[in-house]
Amino acid sequence: MMQQYQSNSYLFGGNAPYVEELYEAYLQNPASVPDNWRAYFDAMQNVPAVDGSNGRDIPHAPIVASFAERAKQGPIRTIVASADSDMGRKRVAATQLIAAYRNIGSHWADLDPLKRQERPPLPDLDPAFYGFSEADLDIVFNASNTYFGKESMSLRELLNNLRETYCGTIGFEFMYVSDQAQKRWWQERLETTRSKPVFTLEKKKHILDRLTAAEGLERFLHTKYVGQKRFSLEGGESFIAAMDELIQHAGSKGVQEIVIGMAHRGRLNVLVNTLGKMPADLFAEFEGKHVDDLPAGDVKYHKGFSSDVSTEGGPVHLSLAFNPSHLEIVNPVVEGSAKARQERRGEVGHKEVLPVQVHGDAAFAGQGVVMETLNLAQTRGYGTGGSMHIVINNQIGFTTSDPRDARSTLYCTDVVKMIEAPVLHVNGDDPEAVVYAMQLAVDFRMEFKKDVVVDIICFRKLGHNEQDTPAVTQPLMYKKIAQHPGTRKLYADKLAAQNLVPAEFGDEKVKAYRAAMDAGKHTADPVLSNFKNKFAVDWMPFLNRKWTDAADTAVPVTELKRLAERITTTPETLKLHPLVEKVVKDRANMGRGDQPLDWGMGEHLAFASLVSSGYPVRITGQDAGRGTFTHRHAVLHDQARERWDAGSYVPLQNVSENQAPFTVIDSVLSEEAVLGFEYGYSAAEPNALVIWEAQFGDFVNGAQVVIDQFISSGEVKWGRASGLTLMLPHGYEGQGPEHSSARIERFLQLCADHNMQVCQPTTPAQIFHLLRRQMIRLFRKPLVIMTPKSLLRNKDAVSPLSDLAKGHFETVIPDHEELNASKVKRVIMCSGKVYYDLVNTRKEREANDTAVIRLEQLYPFPHKAVAAELKKYPNATEIVWCQDEPQNQGAWFFVQHYIMENMTDGQKLGYAGRPASASPAVGYYAKHNEQQKALLEAAFAKLKGFVLTK
C-alpha cells in the first residue's frame, strides 16, 4: 500500500502545485490532460463555488504569464493567437512538462552513491505522457517562463536543460513554498547554472583536502584505537566539506557566530577537522585522560567545543553544543542558545548568528521533537531567522534500512514541508555538488530568513558503532559498501582524470594528513587562538558559588511604590475588560499599601524591580501572558481593538526609561521543544531571568528528556551552568489525576551535588524574594518552583508591602502562632498549600500543643534552618510530615532521612497524607474531599503505620 502511495506522484501533498498546474492546463484545453484527470476535473465543474455560483472556473496562469511577458517586452504589442489547436495543446503540454520537472524532478535525480536500486521510470517526466512524439522534439517552444537564457528553444533542448537542472546529483524540492518570490529565486538560481557549480582549481583542491581530512581522521582512529566507539563518519566524508563551506560562505555573508547541534555520528570528525580541536587532546580522551575535573563527566562523542575561525568576512565563533544520546533533543537547545546570542546583538542578530542543526535520516523522520522545534521557526518568541539543517543520510538507522520500516514518507526530510522549508537532496559521492548545495542553502537562508535543508545521501561504512557487525542484518547493502572505493578516492581520481592534479596528488594529501595526526597538530585551518568576541559572556563571576551565599533581595518601600505606580498606569486610550480593570485597580491599592499583596502582584513587583535594575526577564509558556489561572495579566488587551494584531499593552515594558527588556511569550503548544529552547537560552545568557511556566505542572513530563539530560545533569556531565526557572502549578484541589501534581518526587529524585533548587513558596513575599534571589545571588542553578493554584486568591495567602522591603527568601517559615513552646508535643512539617489547611484544622481542634512549620525549600535541604526550628520545641516527642500527595509521591521519601538527621534522640517521625497510589490523584471530587479530611485528621491523631524513631 505504501509503495502504491509513493509510486503515484500526484498523491503527495507536497506536489499540490503540480496538480494545480495540471488543472490550469485543463481549464485552457480539457483535451490536453490525461483521460482520468479530465474526468476528475469535469466532475469538479459541477461543484458550486464558495459564493454559491455555478460558473465555470477561469484559468489564472495565462493572465499571470501574460503580465509577466508584457513586463519583459516593455511596450505592449498585439499577439495573434494561433489557429492551430494542436499546437496550442502542445504549448500547454510544454508548460506542464516544465512544471513536472520543477515539482518532482528530484524523484528521478541521481542521489544514491550505492545505486542499490534502478531509478524507476516516472511517466510525468516523459514527454510522451503529454502527447509528444519523437518528431515533436525539434519543435521550438516559447521558453520565457524559464531561466535557461533563451526566449525559445526546441523541446529537445528544453528537456535536456530540465534534466540537467533537476535530475542530476542534486534533487530540489521547493515548489510547495507559498511565497512566489522564493520559488522564482530557486528557479532562477538553478536554471541559470543548470545546477552545476563552476569552481576554481584551488577550490577543488580545498574540497579534496577536506575529504582527505575526514577520511584520514577516521582511519587513524580505527587503527590506533581499535574497537573503541567513535561513531565513524566513513561513507559520509562530504559532510566535512559541507561544514567547511557553510562556515566560510556564511562568514562572507556577515555571519559572526554559528551554534551547531549534532548527534554522535561524525562528531569527533567535526571537533577536529571543523572546529580545530587539537588531535592530541582527542587522543588523550581515547586514552582515558581528562583535562576537566567534573563530578561525572561524559563520553567524548557527547562533548561540546567552541573556537574561532577565520573567514573571508572576518572571524566566526563556532559553538558545538553539548548533547546526550537522545537523538534530536539538542535541536531546541541550539535554537534557544542562538536566540539568546542574537538578542545580545540587537536588530542585526538574525544576520550575525546562525543556528545549524545536523541530523541523521532515521531520527529526523522519527523523533517528535523535530516537528516541535520546526514549529517554532517563524514564531515571534522563538524564531531565529532561519536554521540550516544538514542530514547525514546514510540510509540506515542502527539496523533499520528498509524505508518501509523507517518512515511513512518518501523522504526523511518531508517533515520540513510543514514550514515550507526547501530541501536539497544531494549525492554524497559528488563533493562539488554537496558544496554547491551548501552555498545555495546559505544564500537562501540569508536572503529569506527561513529554514533550509541539505540532505546528503551517503552510506555508513561501518556499523552503528565500531563494535557492531552490520552485515548480519544488511548483507546486500554491505556488499555494495565493501566494493565502494570511498568518496575521497573517487574525487581524487576524477581530478587526476581531468588533468587538474597529478596522479599522485591525492596520495600525497593522505600522507600529509597522517603526519599531522601523528604529530597531534591542528587540521582545521585557520583557527584563531587569541580572538576576543565582544559579545561573549563572562561566566567567571558565577563559578564556585554556594546556595547559601547571601543575597539582598529587599527593595525600599519608596521604590516599590514607584514600581507599583508604573505597572498600574495604563494609556488613556486602552479600554480594559471589567475583570482586568479591577485587577489593575486592586494592584494600585496594593502598591500604595492600602491592601495586602496577592500572588500576581508579588510576581509583578519582582519582575519590575529586576528589569529596573538591569536584569532582563523572559517568561514563556502556553498561557504566560495571562496566567493559566488568570492571576498574572502581564499583557493587557484593549477591548476596543479594531485589528487582531494590535491593541495590547505590557506594563512591565514601561517601568523605567533605561530598563532591561521584559519579554512574555504565549508559547506554541509544546513542552519538550519549548523547555529545551528556554534551557538553551538560559545556558547562553546568565544575566537574564529565564522562566518557563507549565500550563499545569502535570504536563511537565512531556519534557522529561530535557529535565533528565540537560537541566538536572548538564553541569556535572559537561560543566554547563544554567539559571533556568521552571514554574509548575501544583496542588491537590480535586481536579483529578491530570491537573493536580507536577510530580515533585521526580525532581527530588534527580537532586544531588547541589545541581538544582526545588522550592514551594506559599506567600507573595516569598515568590518576590525567590525570583529576585535567582538573579541577585551569583549562583546559577536551575530553579524548580511548585507554584500554587487556589492560593492565588486565598485571602490568607497574602503579604503586606513591607515584607518586600525587608528580609529575604525564607527556606523554612516558622510557626507564627503565639504558642507556648515548652508545651508543644508535636511538630507538623509540611510544604505548600496544605499548610493553610493544617492551621485552619488546628484552630478548629484548638490543638495548641502542635506547631506547624513550612518547608519552602526542599533542595538543597536547609539543615540549619530546620534544626533551629525543631530546637524551639524541646518537649516535642513527635514529628509529622504532612503532604497532599500520595505516600509514594510528594516529598515524603526524600525528606524523611533529612528530617531524621535533625531530630533529637527518642523523637518519632510519622506520615500523614494520602495512601500510596499508582495515579497522582483521584478523579472523583467526593473521594478527594474524603482523602483530604482523612490526611488532616491523621496529622493531629495518634501516629500510625510507618513510624521512624531516632
UniProtKB/Swiss-Prot annotation:
PANTHER family: 2-OXOADIPATE DEHYDROGENASE COMPLEX COMPONENT E1 (PTHR23152:SF4), 2-OXOGLUTARATE DEHYDROGENASE (PTHR23152). Coiled coil: none annotated. GO terms for molecular function: oxoglutarate dehydrogenase (succinyl-transferring) activity; thiamine pyrophosphate binding. InterPro entries: 2-oxogl_dehyd_N, 2oxoglutarate_DH_E1, DH_E1, KGD_C_sf, ODO-1/KGD_C, THDP-binding, Transketolase-like_Pyr-bd. Homodimer. Part of the 2-oxoglutarate dehydrogenase (OGDH) complex composed of E1 (2-oxoglutarate dehydrogenase), E2 (dihydrolipoamide succinyltransferase) and E3 (dihydrolipoamide dehydrogenase); the complex contains multiple copies of the three enzymatic components (E1, E2 and E3). The keyword Oxidoreductase applies. CDD domains: TPP_E1_OGDC_like. GO terms for cellular component: cytosol; oxoglutarate dehydrogenase complex. This is 2-oxoglutarate dehydrogenase E1 component. The keyword Mitochondrion does not apply. One of its GO terms (biological process) is tricarboxylic acid cycle. The gene is odhA. Keywords: Glycolysis, Oxidoreductase, Thiamine pyrophosphate. The lineage of its organism: Bacteria, Pseudomonadati, Pseudomonadota, Betaproteobacteria, Burkholderiales. Its EC number is 1.2.4.2. It comes from Cupriavidus necator (strain ATCC 17699 / DSM 428 / KCTC 22496 / NCIMB 10442 / H16 / Stanier 337) (Ralstonia eutropha). E1 component of the 2-oxoglutarate dehydrogenase (OGDH) complex which catalyzes the decarboxylation of 2-oxoglutarate, the first step in the conversion of 2-oxoglutarate to succinyl-CoA and CO(2). Its cofactor is thiamine diphosphate. It holds the Pfam family OxoGdeHyase_C. Belongs to the alpha-ketoglutarate dehydrogenase family. It catalyses: N(6)-[(R)-lipoyl]-L-lysyl-[protein] + 2-oxoglutarate + H(+) = N(6)-[(R)-S(8)-succinyldihydrolipoyl]-L-lysyl-[protein] + CO2.
